[in-house]
Amino acid sequence: MDLKDYVRIFDTTLRDGEQCPGAAMTENEKLEIASQLATMKVDIIEAGFPVSSPVQFQAVERIARETEGPMIAALARAMKADIEAASKALQPAKKRRIHTFIASSPIHMKYKLGKEPKEVLKMAVEAVTLCRQFVDDVEFSPEDATRSEPEFLRELCEAVIAAGATTINIPDTVGYTTPAEYGGLFKFLLSNVRGAEKIIFSAHCHNDLGLATANSLAAVQNGARQIECTINGIGERAGNTAMEEVVMAMRTRKDTFGIQTQIKTEEIARASYLVKTITGMLVQPNKAIVGANAFAHESGIHQDGVIKHRETYEIMKPETVGLSSNRMVLGRHSGRAGFKDRIVKLGFSPQVEELEAAYQRFLEIADRKKEIYDEDIRALFSEEARKSTGDRFQLEGFTVSTGTKSTPTAGVRILIDGHVREESATGDGPVDAIYKAIQKTTGMDPEVSRLVISPVTEGQDAMAEASVTLEYKGDRVVGKGSSTDIIEACSRAYISALNRL
């Protein structure tokens, strides 16, 4: 495909996205997301920042070894140790990219680096030159580019192109720019940088002013041929450009943009749900493309129009992002075949053991809930699929007693390394009581830093999904649990998190 009529998608969910508070992921979780990104046909996956910690290094190395299809990138400051660590971590990958950066704005050079522009220019050239000794594909980012002097930015870009950079990324590091300014900056650079026609210019935007998507699209309209983004727009502060938004904007408004990505858009909903489940970062209902209300129509006038002709109020079909236009309803009389068929249609590839465990949970839920929808099935299957045969703790049962004039008391029965243990405790509410009982049973007392309970579907018998973030001895993990019983959902989430510590 000609690079000039194709926008590369550079996904940084595993690097920039993970910098969002509370979004830390385990190595296995990162690999799971990387696999989904590969299924979506993402062009480049930024797997992490190898020099920052042994855990980061191992995660990048494993993704490089086990993820087929996309190019795997690793971040490195313009420093020899960073670049060497990135190169080593990327070694198993078939397609490798080192992404090196250094600040270029006056405020960053003066107060963060304590360097003069000439020194920064020299460091950038040396970094790119060193990168090219290890890989053929090198990306360079002048950090805080949108607050940099345009002429210095031009000089810096020319120098790193001459040194061997194949992609130059123009980051709006603090989310300060506007579409007109950002588009104008790309137009200036592509028109004035010697060698610009030989490389790819990339957009990397943050959402501090709510303009990340608009800015990225303005860059594309002015020559950018790569967008750096994350699933659900997660990232530091207000987040990054949301992949689903820029991809669907270019697809839906191809008349305006005249250019496409190669993303398999039918995988967007599954990717969104996966990232939400793993990180515990909920998606707002009115979030474009992947929010629960994105394709909902409550107004009678709108409903009437959609029934008569979908395009009256729908500019894209839910099926294009992997959502079913018709919600399938299952119940207690649904068999394994129907259940498996629905799981597959929701985008999962179940193993025999996962399917059986999920089906047994489905039957339990069906005894309490008359109608089970796609959202319910997705929640319970995701929970079962995340379990491991090596999990130390399994919730066997619990009891709770509470009331307005009684002390909340909970008892739990937990299978620990094959042996059943029971304990009880009191607490400030039923959830606190059951968490304290679990702590007594397991001998672990992590701090609950975050607990979010949200309905999966509507109605009195709706499934609830709980997400709990635990902190223990320097580690932070997220656990998820679902049930029609809120206390059970919270208990399952807590046990799920403990198994990740």
From Swiss-Prot:
Cofactor(s) of this protein: Mn(2+)
Subcellular location, principal: cytoplasm
Keywords: Amino-acid biosynthesis, Branched-chain amino acid biosynthesis, Cytoplasm, Leucine biosynthesis, Manganese, Metal-binding, Transferase
Organism field: Leptospira interrogans serogroup Icterohaemorrhagiae serovar Lai (strain 56601)
PROSITE patterns registered for this protein in UniProt: AIPM_HOMOCIT_SYNTH_1, AIPM_HOMOCIT_SYNTH_2, PYR_CT
Protein name: 2-isopropylmalate synthase 1
InterPro entries: 2-IPM_HCS-like (IPR050073), 2-isopropylmalate_synth_dimer (IPR013709), AIPM/Hcit_synth_CS (IPR002034), Aldolase_TIM (IPR013785), LeuA/HCS_post-cat (IPR054691), LeuA_allosteric_dom_sf (IPR036230), LeuA_bact_synth (IPR005671), PYR_CT (IPR000891)
The gene coding this protein: leuA1
CDD domains: DRE_TIM_IPMS (cd07940)
